[in-house]
Amino acid sequence: MATNTEQQTIIRQAGRSDAASIASIYNHYVAETVVTFDEQPISKEEMARRVEEVQAAALPWLVAEHDDRVVGYAYAAPWKRRAAYRFSVEITVYLDPNYFGRKLGTKLYNELFANLRSTQAHAVIGGIALPNDASVALHEKFGMHKVAVFEEVGFKFNRWIDVGYWERTL
């Protein structure tokens, strides 16, 4: 667990009791942005199921807690289900918009990458709905490089969305 006493931010493993807070953060992005391709809000029960599924795969799901409130999260999930992909993971980070600019994404990814080094993960992949300069910068800060852009693979809010993929190995 990482702490920053100056800002009272703790990075820790998510628990079932965090599901409502995680869903609230995520549902902002569902309703207001194209960074997720979900189009309907998800319930806290569905979010709890997602967290449990990731953790059952022995992968990290972390939350950033500031003053006892979950204000962001990051996790690594299996990249694909077929056996030969078993050493590849996809990483994701979401922040409460009220906490942008506080380097929480960096703190979460620092801890996420540290956690991943103790797993069997080899390839780390990040998918980014484009354009998204902040997310691109965060992923590149962690040594990831662009390997692909899939054009017009998503359609949300009456427009086509490209998705770029960034990758690195551990």
Protein language model annotation of sequence segments:
Residues 41-98, 109-110, 115, 169:
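Acetyl-CoA-dependent GNAT
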Residues 101-114, 137-141:
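Conserved acetyl-CoA-binding loop-helix of GNAT-fold acetyltransferases
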Residues 75-78, 125-128, 140, 145-162:
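Conserved catalytic-core motifs of GNAT/GCN5-like acyltransferases
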Residues 10-22:
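A short beta-loop-alpha structural element at the N-terminal edge
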Residues 100, 126-136:
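Conserved beta-strand-loop-alpha-helix junction that forms the acyl-donor binding cleft
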Residues 116-128:
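Conserved GNAT acetyl-CoA-binding A-motif
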Residues 9, 69-73, 161:
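Glycine-rich phosphate/pyrophosphate-binding loop shared by adenosine-nucleotide-utilizing enzymes
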Residues 23-51:
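Conserved GNAT-fold acetyl-CoA-binding loop/helix
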